[in-house]
């Protein structure tokens, strides 16, 4: 026996050493290089802790389809002309290419032409128009599917090439869904420059300027503005549409931007270009930065052999004409061709800074994106904010640990020390497991670790309370300890499984940081089972063998309790009904987009700033109102030197908003300097997707809990547990809605965590009710009251340990985790109440009603049987009696 215990201790010791070895690089930076290379690199910090950018890019598949059809349109004009077919190719609109066959008698030849040259196009039913036929061509479904896949793959490759040349350490680029790319850039120093580099399509085109057309564009634009055909702030597409009947059919209008050498200002002017693209960026072999005559940088472009040949031909055939160089729909320069240019070189000039010219060279070398990309989510965390989050997370975790250690020693004496040992072992193994698995530690992940600290001792509380009962029942010390572990085993398993169900839902439907929380919580729960059931048992086995433990000495609350919880059910149902009604109203309103939704669910921009001196919210609000930003939501945090500004709807990017906001405040408060330390931008599509995923995660976790509880106990217990869980989630949601607390992704995470955790107390109560129903006789209400009174102290204690750590998280964990902690604080209180006053009384009411219905049904059956017997007596005539005569 002693040898077995020693081997178990050795096993625990080896596990602890391995965990420390893997987590050591995260604690100290004084390790040799080979340690990180061959042993462990420690915990990987998420972007929210070490700073950086997290982007979700939406690839515009419609533009990819439009680009493909535009290429087909250009090829069709040339190929049809070679075949002698008279066709008019229109402009691509809504993924459709209109083509008119001038001579309807050539229909068969045209259809053969399409089949041979453009098999990927589908032609609709032709429409007759005065001797001609009008076709609408579109890509067939297979081609669209392949194009989408090809576009996403090419976009991913182009972005990877750009970022690699930009020089970011350990970037992450992964596909998400069918049209999105997730980009993570840890430690990026210039976020706006990185955004410009990533978002630039870099579509390079060469087109001829139509100087021969007798068109006065400035005059036409002025007239269109006067008549209202064109609105101020027009886009190029709107300009071409408004002046379509004033310019040649094969021309289109572009805007040229150039620097005025005399004034140094950037000027814009319209240019009329030929639609035909003579050369594209696909022919580029290299692009480098050079310095021009005016000491200004420009980009020198080298073409490949085919591009050099084409460029020489183009310049040779168009001497004395202007050749426009177009980048992403903007004319960068339009020089006059003086002579044929050989050697395959060209220059792109403009008002570039050295950094801008360098980045343009990067995107040209990496190649153009096959379609435009839109940034639908942008979360940027400065290194200062990340370091502050780590500091506050560690402070909250340390304080929470000390509070739990002190409480357990106070209440359970020496056994509390054993539970504290298991908790510390749990944290060490958890950090080691995260390092071993290469998991990324995020700020929500730190919250998961802190939450695990409180939950780590819950299992020991259940074991100790069972030990107390066994010991008070007169059993020997060893039998009491064995009974404590044996009888608490399935209760512990049930409570942990329900938490794991919600953690799985969070992992499946959460975003990156929330997935980190789910992984941390799952590992914490699994390791808690190991440390509570194995780690502490080894200690008690050792103490019993050595005869060092003589008795169990525990503090005890609520001695000889006899509270009529079932009798109070009607009052509890009224209170709970009001809370649930409030929660349902909140859920409906929030689902419709009303209420204080965070930018994750409403869309918009969130900017976090720090100031050198304290300021007042009213002063900031007045400044923003004067500048037309009165709709912005303002929150002051952390001692009056930090500011959060939220704009739910804005056409500007979060980078532009943050720069403008900082300039605005610094000019209005010259004695106080504001600096942007973090920013978020969520597009409408992402916010809607996150909202839907949150709802699905809640539904999935609830269904999983119902199924498990119904399987482990019986159906009515599953119903009671589910109603109690819904009650807890709705109550917290309703309170948040009532007091206008912002509903963020972390709050939803807290609600889902609460859904699993609040069942811990409910499972404890249900397990005792089931046990007493099997071994005791009496009325149902009396047995339920007895069961709840017996487990009341452990219910309150398990809630208290978690309450202490989330309280520390609320006060010391920083503003980001504050609402998460508040939701958990409310959830612990409401969950304790519901396990006592809601879940058990529901089981009582259901069983009582079922029994009443059963009795009533039996009475009805008996009455029907009596009625049937009476009817039978009436319809059945008695046999006639024989008359007896005397002889």
Model feature map: region roles:
Residues 1-53, 130, 566-590:
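Hydrophobic alpha-helical transmembrane signal-anchor segments
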Residues 2-6, 300, 306-324, 387-444, ...:
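Interfacial segments of transmembrane alpha-helices in multi-pass membrane proteins
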Residues 61-336, 688:
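Non-transmembrane, solvent-exposed regions of membrane trafficking/translocation machinery
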Residues 425, 432-433, 469-579, 812-887:
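Hydrophobic alpha-helical transmembrane segments of membrane transport and translocation systems
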Residues 384-404, 455, 475-511, 564, ...:
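Pore- and gate-forming transmembrane helices of large, multi-pass membrane proteins
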Residues 11-19, 417-438, 449-456, 513, ...:
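Small-residue-enriched core segments of transmembrane alpha-helices in multipass membrane transport
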Residues 454-497, 541-549, 741-798, 838, ...:
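Cytosolic juxtamembrane regions of multi-pass inner-membrane proteins
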Residues 152-153, 158-165, 169-170, 251-381, ...:
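Extracytoplasmic
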């Amino acid at each position: 026996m002693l040898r077995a215990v020693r081997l178990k201790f050795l096993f625990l010791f080896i596990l602890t050493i391995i965990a420390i070895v893997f987590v050591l690089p995260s604690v100290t930076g004084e390790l040799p290089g080979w340690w990180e290379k061959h042993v462990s690199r420690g915990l990987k910090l998420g972007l929210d802790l070490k700073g950086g950018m997290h982007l979700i890019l939406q690839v515009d598949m419609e533009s990819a389809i439009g680009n493909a059809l535009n290429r087909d349109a250009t090829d069709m004009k040339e190929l049809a002309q070679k075949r002698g077919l008279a066709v008019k190719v229109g402009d691509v609109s809504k993924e459709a290419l209109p083509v008119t066959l001038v001579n309807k008698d050539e229909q068969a030849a045209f259809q053969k032409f399409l089949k041979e040259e453009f098999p990927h196009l589908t032609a609709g039913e032709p429409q007759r128009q005065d001797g001609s036929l009008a076709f609408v061509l579109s890509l067939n479904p297979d081609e669209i599917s392949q194009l989408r896949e090809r576009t996403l793959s090419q976009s991913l490759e182009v972005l990877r090439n750009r970022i690699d040349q930009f020089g970011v350490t350990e970037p992450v680029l992964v596909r998400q869904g069918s049209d999105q790319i997730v980009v993570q850039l840890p430690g990026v120093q210039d976020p706006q420059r990185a955004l410009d580099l990533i978002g630039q399509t870099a579509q390079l085109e060469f087109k001829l300027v139509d100087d021969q057309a007798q068109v006065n564009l400035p005059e036409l634009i002025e007239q269109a503005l006067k008549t209202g055909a064109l609105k101020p702030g027009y886009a190029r597409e709107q300009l071409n549409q408004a002046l379509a009947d004033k310019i040649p059919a094969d021309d289109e209008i572009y805007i040229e931007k150039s620097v005025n050498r005399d004034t140094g200002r950037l000027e814009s002017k319209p240019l009329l270009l030929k639609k035909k693209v003579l050369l594209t960026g696909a022919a580029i072999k290299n692009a480098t930065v050079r310095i021009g005559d005016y000491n200004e940088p420009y980009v020198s472009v080298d073409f490949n052999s085919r591009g050099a040949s084409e460029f020489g031909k183009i310049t040779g055939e168009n001497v004395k004409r202007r050749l426009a160089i177009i980048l992403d729909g903007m004319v960068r320069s339009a020089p006059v061709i003086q002579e044929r240019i050989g050697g395959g070189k060209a220059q792109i000039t403009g008002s570039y800074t050295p950094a801008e010219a360098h980045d343009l060279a990067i995107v040209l070398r990496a190649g153009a994106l096959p379609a435009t990309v839109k940034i639908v989510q942008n979360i940027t965390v400065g290194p200062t904010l990340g370091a502050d989050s780590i500091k506050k997370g560690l402070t909250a975790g340390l304080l929470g640990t000390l509070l739990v250690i002190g409480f357990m020693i106070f209440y359970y004496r020496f056994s509390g020390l054993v539970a504290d040992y298991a908790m510390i072992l749990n944290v060490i193994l958890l950090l080691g497991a995260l390092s071993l698995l290469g998991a990324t530690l995020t700020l929500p992940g730190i919250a998961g670790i802190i939450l695990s600290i409180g939950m780590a001792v819950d299992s020991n509380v259940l074991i100790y309370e069972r030990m107390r009962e066994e010991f008070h029942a007169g059993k020997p010390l060893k039998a009491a300890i064995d009974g404590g572990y044996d009888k608490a085993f399935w209760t512990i398993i049930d409570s942990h499984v329900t938490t794991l169900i919600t953690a799985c839902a969070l992992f499946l439907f959460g975003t990156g940081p929330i997935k980190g929380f789910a992984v941390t919580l799952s590992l914490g729960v699994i390791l808690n089972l190991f440390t509570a059931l194995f780690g502490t048992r080894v200690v008690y086995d050792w103490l019993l063998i050595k005869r060092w433990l003589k008795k169990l000495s525990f503090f005890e609350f609520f001695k000889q309790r006899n509270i009529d919880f079932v009798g109070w059910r009607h009052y509890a149902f009224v209170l709970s009904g009001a809370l649930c009604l409030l929660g349902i109203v909140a859920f409906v309103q929030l689902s419709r987009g009303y209420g204080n939704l965070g930018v994750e669910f409403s869309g918009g921009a969130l900017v976090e700033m720090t100031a050198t001196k304290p300021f007042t919210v009213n002063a900031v609000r007045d400044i923003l109102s004067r500048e037309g930003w009165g709709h912005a939501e303002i929150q002051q945090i952390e001692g009056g030197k930090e500011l959060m500004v939220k704009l739910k709807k804005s056409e500007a990017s979060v980078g532009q908003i943050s720069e403008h906001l900082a300039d605005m405040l610094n000019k209005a408060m010259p004695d106080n300097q504001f600096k942007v330390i973090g920013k978020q931008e969520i597009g409408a599509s992402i916010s809607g997707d996150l909202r839907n995923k949150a709802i699905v995660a809640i539904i999935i976790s609830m269904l999983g809990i119902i199924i498990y509880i119904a399987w482990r106990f019986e159906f009515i217990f599953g119903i009671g547990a589910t109603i109690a869980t819904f009650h807890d989630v709705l109550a917290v949601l309703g309170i948040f809605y009532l007091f206008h607390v912002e509903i963020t992704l972390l709050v939803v995470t807290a609600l889902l965590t609460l859904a699993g955790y609040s069942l811990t107390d409910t499972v404890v109560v249900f397990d005792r009710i089931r046990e007493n129903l099997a071994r005791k006789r009496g009325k149902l209400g009396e047995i339920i009251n007895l069961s709840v009174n017996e487990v009341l102290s452990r219910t309150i204690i398990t809630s208290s340990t978690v309450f202490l750590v989330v309280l520390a998280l609320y006060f010391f964990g920083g503003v980001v985790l504050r609402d998460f902690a508040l939701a958990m604080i409310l959830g612990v209180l409401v969950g304790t109440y519901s396990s006592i006053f809601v879940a058990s009384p529901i089981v009582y009411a259901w069983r009582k009603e079922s029994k009443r219905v059963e009795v009533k049904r039996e009475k009805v059956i008996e009455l029907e049987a009596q009625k049937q017997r009476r009817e039978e007596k009436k319809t059945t005539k008695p046999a006639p009696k024989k008359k007896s005569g005397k002889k």
